[in-house]
Amino acid sequence: MQAIELKKGMIFNQDGKLIEVLKSNHHKPGKGNTVMQMDLRDVMSGAVVHKTMRPSEKVDLVNVSLKKAQYLYDDDTDFIFMDTDTYEQYLIPKEHLASEAKFLMPNIEVDLKFTDEGKLIGINLPSTVKMTVKETQPEIKGATAAGGGKPATMDTGLVVTVPDFIKEGEELIIGTENGDYKGRADSITR
């Protein structure tokens, strides 16, 4: 496969390491050839790097299979998930899910990602999650919905910019793509 075909979420093998594509953009500088600018994450270490590749550069795509699972809890070193069909439990080291951790709520359904060899390499989050506002500033009289918003700390520690009318204790829908506010949980039907 060529680098130009890589899309977000795909995993390829580079120098014996599994690399996940976080973002991929075509870029045509004023002079010169088109290049691919990508944000890549080492699946095992969690390290994220920005890399520029030629569109024709060859990559070795890794086949990934998915299994439905439920997030149960975490301990000092791992996140624990349960296969919803077999009830088998899987442990993933916390450092491997650094960016996903802030969206993990007990009982949330995720997809576990496995290589063809059966190696667990990560998770796919749902597109949105329901979270509760743990801490935010009180509503300001006269604030409008068109205002810039205010920071709110969710029950996982994630900080989200929310409209001024949001209060502590409210349940919100949060996008997992970039941690943005989607709406109140009671006003959005999924």
Curated annotation (Swiss-Prot):
Pfam families: EFP, EFP_N, Elong-fact-P_C. One of its GO terms (molecular function) is translation elongation factor activity. It is found in: Cytoplasm. One of its GO terms (biological process) is peptide biosynthetic process. GO terms for cellular component: cytoplasm. InterPro entries: Elong-fact-P_C, NA-bd_OB-fold, Rib_uL2_dom2, Transl_elong_fac_P/YeiP, Transl_elong_KOW-like, Transl_elong_P/YeiP_cen, Transl_elong_P/YeiP_CS, Transl_elongation_fac_P. Keywords: Cytoplasm, Elongation factor, Protein biosynthesis. Pathway: Protein biosynthesis; polypeptide chain elongation. It comes from the Bacteria. Involved in peptide bond synthesis. Stimulates efficient translation and peptide-bond synthesis on native or reconstituted 70S ribosomes in vitro. Probably functions indirectly by altering the affinity of the ribosome for aminoacyl-tRNA, thus increasing their reactivity as acceptors for peptidyl transferase. Belongs to the elongation factor P family. This is Elongation factor P 1. It comes from Lactobacillus johnsonii (strain CNCM I-12250 / La1 / NCC 533). The gene is efp1.
